[in-house]
Amino acid sequence: MIEMDQNFNKVFWDACANGDFPMVCSQIKAGADVNYQNGDGRTALMRASKRDRKDVVQVLLDNGADVNISDNKGKTALMTAAKKGNKTILKALIDAGADVNAKDDRGRTALMRACLLGQDRCVEVLLDAGARINDQDEVGRSALMEACIAFKRDTIHLLLERNADVNLFDNNGVTALM
């Protein structure tokens, strides 16, 4: 028998994912918990960020959604927005106080995620907001190394213009230049 979480609001959760703005507003007005975390630790804000639901993200923020909640793997809504390349959502999350240097359970940051996928507009926003360009994850990779691994030339150029350290070594003694 599956035990149902009494705090879970499927209507609200699905409305956030599907971008049903009127339903999201209605559910918030009816008392939906904007910071509820499911079994994986994910929130409605993470779900809306992942699905590029700009209006839903903003109404969640306006109603107290915590931008720095992390899921069971340490991922935040900011990391999701950076990975998806949604500059508007990324800026809204940063403006709401998201930690641009938060790390997931593998030590990866939103900047590293954006660099791996070549999301240059998000890379610029994160750097402008104070993201540390030379942070390294648990295997020693930096944002520059991630961009190099993925052959993201424009991202590499952008990081070099912003003084990314080309001499950092990962845990295997490899630099971004190797």
Task: Indicate residue ranges for each PLM-predicted region.
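Ankyrin repeat start-site detector
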Residues: N7, G39-D40, N72-K73, D105-R106, ...
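Ankyrin repeat structural motif
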Residues: D20-I28, R53-L61, N86-I94, Q119-L127, ...
